[in-house]
């Protein structure tokens, strides 16, 4: 089902340009497609590739007779570098943008620590939200294009000392793809320190973030007269807290060279005001709050990555190994966001539900002289796939002898 997309995006060429290694029996594109197949099929670990030892259809997906054994997939992760991942992400995101987010202006950023359950001696401690405390983990960083909700960047090769520079590394990555920096960036208080906000300013990029609530700040706001707070309504559908009060002012931050706009908001379900910081002076306070609320999309996407793409099933304590897994998560997320965009009425459906309703199905594959014919068995959602015409304008599949794929439905 995803072969037409991968061929249209030039996946094989992106793999070649990135310089991924291969073996005498398994070329680089087949190795990566084997790893990607596990993400697309809700498999938790590389060792679970042995579930498909005799599945010829999945072997065909990767351009092989059958998928490689778990020893190969495990070993392959240790042969890649960060440069390989960056090269593949550059090609993938640039090609996918033409289909899903051609006019991208807004990106949400977030860190995600993947907990490690073995010997912690080689790993740094990071705060783990699910445990409510710090623990040994591998820190990963993701970026999400706001409108399409498509992951567009990942890095798992980060140390604590390098953490605050990751935003600028992403900005340079984005500029290399689009010849411009993002117009808006949304991120929480842990992504960068205040000195890094100066560099964001220099890019000409607007940011919205939140400020940590110090006791002195909370006390000062508590002394402000009620007449200095303005009422507003955040009428987002299904939003729980819609009636808010805010105070809009400019403040100074340590290590930040200019005055910054601070919007203090009450009524969001917390005992103390939430402090929004932005360098934009034209948007209303209400619009700033709504913009930052949209950052939940990157958290939702990371939740799906944990739930369906099994991001938290740590591939290794070696960061470079985890980096390849994070890159495969970005690719799998893009595949499912594309699939949802093609299915009318299912644009917002999660990858897990898309998989259950449309991908997890049986059928037959017939390799003909001029094409590869895929017959889907009868299912209630087949009319939706038929209407989407995923195989329209057939594209030759380079790793399948340049044969196009045709879908038929019982």
What are these regions (language model features)?
Residues 112-114, 146, 156-159, 192, ...:
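Short, glycine-/Ser/Thr-/acidic-enriched flexible segments
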Residues 198, 203-307, 394-410:
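An anionic, glycine-rich sequence signature occurring as long contiguous blocks
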Residues 1-133, 140-161, 165-176, 201-203, ...:
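Dynamic "connector" segments at or just before major functional cores
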Residues 56-59, 115-116, 150, 160-162, ...:
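Flexible loop/turn segments at secondary-structure boundaries
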Residues 312-371:
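Basic, amphipathic alpha-helical segments enriched in Lys/Arg and hydrophobic/aromatic residues
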Residues 161-216:
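Domain-level cores of phosphate- or acyl-group-handling catalytic modules
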């Amino acid at each position: 089902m995803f072969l037409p997309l991968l061929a249209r995006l030039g996946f094989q060429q992106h793999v070649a340009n990135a310089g991924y290694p291969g073996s005498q029996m398994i070329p680089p594109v087949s190795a990566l497609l084997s790893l990607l197949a596990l993400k697309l099929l809700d498999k938790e670990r590389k060792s679970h590739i042995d579930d498909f030892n005799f599945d010829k259809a999945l072997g065909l997906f990767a351009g092989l007779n059958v998928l490689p054994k778990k020893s190969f997939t495990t070993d392959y992760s240790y042969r890649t570098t960060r440069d390989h991942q960056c090269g593949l992400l550059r090609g993938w995101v640039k090609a996918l943008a033409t289909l899903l987010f051609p006019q991208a202006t807004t990106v949400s950023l977030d860190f995600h620590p993947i907990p490690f359950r073995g010997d912690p001696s080689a790993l740094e401690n990071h705060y783990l939200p699910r445990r409510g405390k710090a623990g040994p983990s591998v820190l990963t960083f993701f970026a999400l294009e706001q409108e399409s909700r498509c992951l567009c960047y990942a890095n798992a090769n980060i140390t604590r000392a390098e953490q605050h520079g990751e935003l600028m590394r992403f900005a340079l990555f984005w500029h290399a793809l689009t010849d411009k920096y993002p117009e808006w960036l949304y991120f929480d208080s842990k992504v960068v320190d205040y000195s890094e906000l100066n560099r964001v300013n220099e890019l000409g990029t607007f940011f919205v973030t939140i400020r940590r609530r110090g006791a002195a700040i909370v006390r000062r706001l508590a002394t402000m007269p009620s007449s200095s707070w303005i009422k507003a309504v955040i009428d987002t559908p299904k939003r729980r807290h819609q009636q808010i009060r805010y105070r809009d002012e400019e403040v100074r931050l340590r290590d930040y060279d200019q005055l910054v706009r601070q919007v203090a908001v009450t009524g969001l379900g917390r005992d103390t005001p939430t402090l929004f910081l932005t360098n934009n002076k034209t948007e209303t306070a209400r619009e700033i709050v709504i913009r930052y609320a949209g950052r939940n999309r990157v958290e939702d996407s990371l939740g799906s990555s944990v739930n369906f793409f099994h991001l938290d099933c740590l591939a290794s304590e070696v960061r470079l190994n985890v980096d390849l897994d994070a890159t495969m998560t970005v690719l799998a997320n893009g595949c499912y966001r594309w699939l949802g965009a093609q299915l009318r009425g299912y644009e917002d459906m999660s990858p897990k539900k898309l998989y259950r309703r449309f991908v997890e199905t049986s059928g037959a594959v017939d390799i003909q002289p001029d094409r590869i014919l895929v017959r889907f068995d009868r299912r209630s959602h087949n009319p939706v796939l038929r209407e989407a015409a995923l195989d329209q304008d057939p594209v030759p599949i380079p790793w399948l002898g340049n044969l196009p794929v045709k879908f038929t439905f019982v």
